[in-house]
């Protein structure tokens, strides 16, 4: 009984120990979790050994639990020490010193430029020395150029222009640059337009001549039987076969071209004056090319006359006059070209295609009659141009002592020497 009781006590004691061991095991689990938290490896003994020696287990548990605490303290101390070291390193690094303020680079000045404009701070010159005529920089006499913002030697600087010579040379080169091709093209175009306008006005003025009435009234009237300069006397006779003149409304006018040195000045006599007989070009310029270009260059087709051509010829012949001295109206002059005459023959209205200028060789301007001291007159210029369509014909010349007659029936002129 005693042994049993003793065994029970021992068992109780063992249970107590086991309880304590179980309690220690519960603490070990907590410590194991804590050890796992800090990364420590935990080795488990055999179950028998753990059951046989709870104290040993508890001792081992305490021993295993001790290192994590120490390690945790060491880790905590290490973190704390590291923090302290880091703080000491930041406090030890001093901030960089501020840059020195910009100062004037002129010797003897050294003015602080931190409170003025950025232009002077960038070029390191004060306001006073930027305009000074002479300063010393780097041991040399120079002057600050505000055009290029640099210091130049005195020979390189123009005191009058207040600029360096290199800058002035570039400025003058830009000013003397030649004009662009576009501007020169516009200038030539404007000049050509002006020339064209002047040429057009010139053409209009000479294409439509206008003779004032005062000049027309000032022309001397030539009466039948009057003697004009050069000794040419005009006679007006009515021929039996004469056609009525559409110009002045009178009968046909005749003139004689016979004369000699003994009988006096030559007097023209001949057949009837054709209806178109008039003096063209009176009061015109001495150059007969204008009158010829207006009268003879344009061919007139009598079968296909237009009103416009008649109007142009009437305007061109507005300054003509008949042989008897009366001014001729343009409409009557245009009608006279349409009238038949012995000069044109029967082909005047039927031939068609021959110009009136070729059919009227008698038309002579006053400018073509050249009086001389020997009282002779000759036809030139217009007579040759009028006959050039039918072939070359020599210009008739009437000299003193020679006569010429015109045969109306055969339409031929005989010249006697």
UniProtKB/Swiss-Prot annotation:
Q: Name one GO molecular function term.
A: sequence-specific DNA binding
The residues that the entry says bind Zn(2+) 1 are 104, 109, 126, 129
Q: Which domain of life is it from?
A: Eukaryota
- Renumbered to this chain, region (Disordered) spans 1-32, 51-102, 387-417
**Where are zinc fingers of the kind SBP-type found along the chain?**
101-178
> Does DNA-binding count among this protein's keywords?
yes
The record's subcellular locations are: Nucleus
Q: Tissue expression, per UniProt?
A: Expressed in young panicles. Expressed in the shoot apex at both the vegetative and reproductive stages. Highly expressed in the promordia of primary and secondary branches. Highly expressed in young panicles.
Q: Where is the composition biased (Polar residues)?
A: 402-417
Cite the binding residues for Zn(2+) 2. 145, 148, 152, 164
Low complexity bias (residue ranges) = 61-74
In this chain, composition skew of type Gly residues spans: 1-26, 51-60, 75-84
At which positions is motif Bipartite nuclear localization signal? Answer: 161-177
Q: Which GO terms describe its biological process?
A: positive regulation of defense response to bacterium; positive regulation of DNA-templated transcription; regulation of secondary shoot formation
Q: What induces it?
A: Negatively regulated by microRNA miR156.
Per the record's keyword annotation, is DNA repair included, yes or no?
no
The protein's UniProt keywords, in alphabetical order, are:
DNA-binding, Metal-binding, Nucleus, Phosphoprotein, Transcription, Transcription regulation, Ubl conjugation, Zinc, Zinc-finger
- Modified positions (Phosphoserine) are 163
An annotated GO cellular component of this protein is: nucleus
**What's the miscellaneous note?**
Plants overexpressing SPL14/IPA1 exhibit enhanced disease resistance against the bacterial pathogen Xanthomonas oryzae pv oryzae (Xoo), and increased grain yield.
Q: How does it assemble?
A: Interacts with PCF1 and PCF2. Interacts with IPI1. Interacts with D53. Interacts with SLR1. Interacts (via C-terminus) with SHI1.
Function field: Transcriptional activator that binds to the SBP-box DNA core binding motif 5'-GTAC-3'. Can target the TCP motif 5'-TGGGCC/T-3' through interaction with PCF1 and PCF2. Key regulator of the plant architecture that controls shoot branching and panicle development. Promotes panicle branching. Promotes high grain yield. Binds to the promoters of TB1 and DEP1. Suppresses rice tillering mainly through positive regulation of TB1. Regulates plant height and panicle length through positive regulation of DEP1. Repressed by D53 in strigolactone (SL) signaling.
Task: Please name the PANTHER family in this protein's record.
Answer: SQUAMOSA PROMOTER-BINDING-LIKE PROTEIN 4 (PTHR31251), SQUAMOSA PROMOTER-BINDING-LIKE PROTEIN 6 (PTHR31251:SF226)
Notes concerning its domains? The SBP-type zinc finger is required for the binding to DNA.
Tell me the protein's name: Squamosa promoter-binding-like protein 14
**Organism field:** Oryza sativa subsp. japonica
């Amino acid at each position: 009984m005693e042994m049993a009781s003793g065994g029970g006590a021992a068992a109780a004691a063992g249970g107590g120990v086991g309880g304590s061991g179980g309690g220690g095991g519960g603490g070990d689990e907590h410590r194991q979790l804590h050890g796992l938290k800090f990364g420590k490896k935990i080795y488990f003994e055999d179950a028998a050994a753990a059951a046989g020696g709870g104290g040993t287990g508890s001792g081992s548990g305490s021993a295993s639990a001790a290192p994590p605490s120490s390690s945790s303290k060491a880790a905590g101390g290490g973190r704390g020490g590291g923090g302290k070291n880091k703080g000491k390193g930041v406090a030890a690094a001093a901030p960089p010193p501020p840059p020195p303020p910009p100062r004037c680079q002129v010797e003897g000045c050294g003015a602080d430029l931190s409170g003025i404009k950025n232009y002077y701070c960038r070029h390191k010159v004060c306001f006073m020395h930027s305009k000074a005529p002479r300063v010393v920089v780097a041991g040399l006499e120079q002057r600050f150029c505000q055009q290029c913002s640099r210091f130049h030697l005195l020979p390189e600087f123009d005191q009058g222009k207040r600029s360096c010579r290199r800058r002035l040379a570039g400025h003058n080169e830009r000013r003397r640059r030649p004009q662009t091709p576009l501007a020169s093209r516009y200038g030539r175009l404007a000049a050509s337009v002006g020339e064209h306008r002047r040429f057009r006005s010139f053409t209009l003025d000479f294409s439509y001549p206008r003779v004032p009435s005062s000049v027309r009234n000032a022309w001397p009237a030539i009466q039948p039987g009057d003697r004009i300069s050069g000794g040419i006397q005009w006679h007006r006779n009515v021929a039996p076969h004469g056609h009525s003149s559409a110009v002045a409304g009178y009968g046909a006018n005749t003139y004689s071209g016979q004369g000699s040195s003994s009988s006096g000045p030559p007097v023209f006599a001949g057949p009837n004056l054709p209806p178109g007989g008039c003096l063209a070009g009176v009061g015109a310029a001495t150059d007969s090319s204008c009158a010829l270009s207006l009268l003879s260059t344009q061919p007139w087709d009598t079968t296909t006359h237009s009103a416009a051509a008649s109007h142009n010829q009437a305007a061109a012949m507005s300054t003509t006059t008949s042989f008897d001295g009366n001014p001729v109206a343009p409409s009557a002059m245009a009608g006279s070209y349409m009238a038949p005459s012995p000069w044109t023959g029967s082909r005047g209205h039927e031939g068609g295609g021959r110009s009136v200028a070729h059919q009227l060789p008698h038309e002579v301007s006053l400018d073509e009659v050249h009086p001389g001291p020997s009282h002779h007159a000759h036809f030139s210029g217009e007579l040759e141009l009028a006959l050039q369509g039918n072939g070359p014909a020599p210009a008739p010349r009437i000299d003193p002592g020679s006569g010429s007659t015109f045969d109306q029936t055969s339409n031929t002129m005989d010249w006697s020497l």
